A protein has these predicted regions:
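TPR/TPR-like (Sel1-like) alpha-helical repeat modules
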Residues: 79-82, 111-112, 141-148, 169, ...
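TPR alpha-solenoid repeat register
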Residues: 52, 85-86, 160, 194
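Alpha-helical segment of the N-proximal tetratricopeptide repeat
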Residues: 9-48, 54-55, 61
Length: 202
């Protein structure tokens, strides 16, 4: 609310805050077209609101509008200096085959290292980008840097292991893929589609 009041004034800011709450509610329930309708007017009313730009970028990303999503998330980055949406922005560039920009974002994120979760997501996107360009070895090497046994794996560990197992399978290294899918299943049998992936590797 404070942010919206700062960019639109107290009265208008309160109205905008209610509208962005509606858009957030729709987004969280995967009603992306509804969220998009609400956000169109918000972008016009509060173009310098980071919260509006961020949510609009995320909605556009979820609906596969990569160029528009990248534009919004770049604006969010300019307004805040935040690394929060670097992985999503990088994945948008990856979808657009703007691989150099995706790699630059990964390097920024890696050097800043704002949080383990963000760096993990950025690493997954960067590895995927390298794989998309035919560099499976480079993609695998990048994710192997995060391959260490932990007593209580968190979601970020499982996501990186899954991405790496998928790359092993694509590279034809089925024993390593199987081992890593088994490690994920041991930590969380319901994670992703790990059961069906293991069945397909028998």
């Amino acid at each position: 609310v404070d942010e919206l009041e700062a960019v639109a004034g107290p009265l208008e800011g309160s109205k905008l805050a209610a509208r962005i709450a509606d858009a957030t509610y729709a987004y969280e329930r995967e009603r992306y077209q509804e969220a998009r309708r609400i956000l169109r007017s918000l972008v016009e009313s509060a173009p310098n609101s980071p919260a509006v730009r961020e949510l609009n970028g995320l909605v556009l990303y979820r609906t596969g509008q990569w160029a528009a999503a990248a534009k919004e998330l770049e604006r969010y980055r300019e307004l805040t200096g935040s690394y929060d949406q670097h992985p999503v922005l990088a994945d948008s560039y990856r979808a657009l085959r703007r691989y150099e920009e995706a790699e630059d974002l990964w390097q920024d994120l890696r050097e800043a290292s704002p949080s383990g979760d963000l760096v993990a997501e950025g690493r997954i996107v960067a590895a995927g980008s390298r794989a998309d360009q035919g560099d499976l070895t480079g993609a695998i090497n990048l994710l192997e840097k995060a391959l260490r046994r932990v007593n209580h794996p968190q979601e970020r560990h499982l996501r990186q292991w899954y991405a790496l197992a998928d790359l092993y399978e694509r590279a034809g290294d089925l024993p390593r893929a199987r081992d890593l899918f088994n490690r994920i299943a041991s930590a969380d049998p319901e994670a992703f589609d790990v059961r069906s992936r293991l069945r397909s590797l028998r």
